[in-house]
């Protein structure tokens, strides 16, 4: 049944958990053709955060993508097809006021997706990188309830920069982009113009 789905809890900071997720999906539905690396956390704002906090954000926002690619891409190359979708952020193209760890890891996630595309694109592996701005999820408002001004500023900066989209609207944009196999997926079109301004300002 093409509409069937299962929910599996997994800690993406654990390679074996991701491997188990892939194996469960394959057991239920057959080979994995499309993988969304979508987990993300913000991390504490500002400088001076503990190295353990940096490690946690790196594990979820970046290394989880690397782990999944290590598990899936060799098989995709062997059979000549597969699709890896990485959720980064507009912060991966611009920057994020507030959490340095979030901004750095989203830049890195974008870079890893681009590397995957350049390296394996001619071997049948397609890659897209989703870089939304404000989306109406709890993650967006994490800084609003922060006990620091910098954390609250991060939320205000994102919500003030453009429309806050509903998750369903973002999903529609993603589905259309995947049909056309676009690498860069921008649910907020204004992000592209901001990115161009950023490049021109250096």
Locations of the language-model features?
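Active-site loop-to-helix junction immediately N-terminal to the catalytic Tyr of the SDR YXXXK motif
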Residues: 49, 95-103, 115
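Conserved NAD(P)H cofactor-binding loop of Rossmann-fold oxidoreductase domains
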Residues: 38-43
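Active-site helix of classical SDR
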Residues: 69, 105
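Substrate-binding pocket helix/loop in short-chain dehydrogenase/reductase
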Residues: 45-58
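Residue(s) in the substrate-gating loop at a strand-loop-helix junction
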Residues: 89
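The beta1-alpha1 cofactor-binding region of Rossmann-like NAD(H)/NADP(H)-dependent oxidoreductases
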Residues: 9-20, 51
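SDR active-site lid
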Residues: 118-189
